[in-house]
């Protein structure tokens, strides 16, 4: 086992990365190794998808499957070894079908990629785990060095984050053949184990640029189906009655669940990255979408244990449900998996609803506590002139984007302390689950404009980018000249690709934390600092002083 893709990875003087019987996320060595094997199979599939396009062959089933299966290897998504192997077998079957199509056009068609002919050696998981050792990401570290390995992983993990957003977009009917072509090209190239530093740096920027397009079509999918988010108050306390909790990012799953629970007497609560769903008109119209429950994903083993109803996980993040003994009432969807828990195939939530009706639910309603969400792209752009006016009248000094992933590390209290230390004449724009560090606190307003503005899920970084570009255009300056600072918390691969997106767009002087990615060497950190001004958090006082004086 070698996995260094998330922020909580093991860090020792001897090196970074989880390499024992179990990773910090709870992933076993078996599952981790089989995910490496799956990635190799997907690289072979992408290699033939690239070749097929040379013959004018585009298979949408392949284009849809490849990023979805890659998504299953993202942190806290799928811990179920047999399902991981199932994805690998499906990838190989699709690859062979593509290969046959190419050969039907050109009898001499061939693919030079080293992953292009990969076959699984056995049906036995132990044998497959031994085969997977050939594809451990750090297997040639001694030959290539830590810097090249770090850049390879930056590209692999960044592409993994983009693949997740591609799947979210596709679920909503949004896709782009040019994006698929670019994805396959990069995925296939990474399967050649590249070792050119400049080429890898260029690839990282290409992934960022590609992901900007992915976030654009994802934004289009969400707003076309569910309307543009508008500011909405959400209750974060319990309401009497039977209940279901839904977590993850998939708004379509939430919509289907709301449709199917309407009139049943079962209330629905959002959790984690589902919180922004309350801002969408077509979702909040359901009166039994009664509120948001819980806090950051890392607290779920305590909070889910206390929730008196079933729980549906639509995407990341799931952690061991046996710890809180709620594994008999947690349900996984799509690419999510945990051994032994119930998995929903298709869009029928009937079994979940039946379980909710058999459970007690909340015995009474608590005193409401309302927070505001729903500052989507349209709302943000509508406020651009107000922001400019406040800046011109020296009522608004600075905007801080404080957001990103949450996690268990104690150092993440930095982001709470930072948000509460922001001066009263400054605004806080937030997104993703890092907001749970401070989103239930009171921040007041500036001439009626809330000082805490919740822009949505992690992918809604797109809205923040569009706002920044609009403000810069109206003020006749560059984005980096705005009174705007980005203070980002990271945890997994979606955060990595959003960072690459920002860097590829030329955004500089981003501050990240609580720690640097474990695959970043001192040399790579120095390169990113020199090229982009990227740096790690220090202390709240020092960072605040530096950002306000920039």
Curated annotation (Swiss-Prot):
CDD domains: HCP (cd01914). It comes from the Bacteria. SUPFAM superfamilies: Prismane protein-like (SSF56821). It is found in: Cytoplasm. The modification Cysteine persulfide is found at residue 405. GO terms for molecular function: 2 iron, 2 sulfur cluster binding; hydroxylamine reductase activity; metal ion binding; peroxidase activity. Catalyzes the reduction of hydroxylamine to form NH(3) and H(2)O. Belongs to the HCP family. This is Hydroxylamine reductase.
